[in-house]
Amino acid sequence: MIILAVESSCDETGVGIAELGDDGTVTLLADEVASSVDEHARFGGVVPEIASRAHLEALGPTMRRALATAGVSKPDVVAATIGPGLAGALLVGVAAAKAYSAAWQVPFYAVNHLGGHLAADVFDHGPLPESIGLLVSGGHTHLLHVRSLGEPIVELGSTVDDAAGEAYDKIARLLGLGYPGGRVLDELAREGDPAAITFPRGMTGPRDDPYAFSFSGLKTAVARYVESHPEASQADVAAGFQEAVADVLTAKAVRAAKDLGVSTLLIAGGVAANSRLRELAGQRCADAGMTLRIPRPRLCTDNGAMIASFAAHLIAAGARPSPLDAASDPGLPVVQGQVA
């Protein structure tokens, strides 16, 4: 079965094509992405209207490239990110996917963007066993129990304020590094000393929810430090901030795995591309005797391949097609894999 999927939840226009084998394996055939990030940089963040217009302009060419790369003229299924995400951006991708589904007369599946991030990993590491999922991106930070990609996902905890990626962008802006800030801040932090400045670790007290996150206090602490220490090394500030984020994320994820008796940790989402998060997670998983799975950086950011993978796993588990009047849902919860 050939599955073509459209991703348009934010500022990347993605079209992915995957094949679902009779044995349940999912093989990537094409992964084409067009990003409008450069158009948003001067505004310091994603502008929804610009993102929607960029999707309209990029979707056709991206679709043609994906079909050519895969050597496919007509898929057996069309899927699309139905949510969460920016309302206008979602609408463009969903409308296009429905149109292709109707024109090709093939089933349509409306699936969850966040589940897609988890499903991207199978292209690098094969079938996913029962796992603790740490999903970290610009808009989301969730700790999840994933029994399989075809079963309902259980949310253990999430951020009570800022997402991890949002905190990265805000600190990068504070340091004058521009937008998007994640990659630039990561590079700067490698030049600094993570022990030079110790920033607070939110939601780590004995009475705090062990699976919840908070990055607002950390963001404020960094801002106050920079204001009161103008002579401080930017690299040290970046390294101290990054260490605080990676410390909390990995400590809570490993704790959840131990609490639930799960031996695999999957880290997914855009922040999963961060070098210190990957390094510290590797160290802590090795110490705990756990298996760590993180997709290659290309598959951590938004793309259509991950949506094709998640749709394939839902189909393999018996999911029925979505109706063509299924509406996009900007606030779709992570526990709802599909809009049926």
From Swiss-Prot:
CDD domains: ASKHA_NBD_TsaD_bac. Substrate binds at residues 135-139, 169, 182, 186, 274. The gene is tsaD. The keyword Transmembrane does not apply. Belongs to the KAE1 / TsaD family. One of its GO terms (cellular component) is cytoplasm. Its main location: cytoplasm. One of its GO terms (molecular function) is N(6)-L-threonylcarbamoyladenine synthase activity. It is found in: Cytoplasm. It comes from Mycolicibacterium vanbaalenii (strain DSM 7251 / JCM 13017 / BCRC 16820 / KCTC 9966 / NRRL B-24157 / PYR-1) (Mycobacterium vanbaalenii). Keywords: Acyltransferase, Cytoplasm, Iron, Metal-binding, Transferase, tRNA processing. Binds 1 Fe(2+) ion per subunit. It catalyses: L-threonylcarbamoyladenylate + adenosine(37) in tRNA = N(6)-L-threonylcarbamoyladenosine(37) in tRNA + AMP + H(+). This is tRNA N6-adenosine threonylcarbamoyltransferase. Its EC number is 2.3.1.234. Fe cation binds at residues 113, 117, 302. Its cofactor is Fe(2+). It comes from the Bacteria. Pfam families: TsaD. GO terms for biological process: tRNA threonylcarbamoyladenosine modification. InterPro entries: ATPase_NBD, Gcp-like_dom, KAE1/TsaD, Peptidase_M22_CS, TsaD. Required for the formation of a threonylcarbamoyl group on adenosine at position 37 (t(6)A37) in tRNAs that read codons beginning with adenine. Is involved in the transfer of the threonylcarbamoyl moiety of threonylcarbamoyl-AMP (TC-AMP) to the N6 group of A37, together with TsaE and TsaB. TsaD likely plays a direct catalytic role in this reaction.
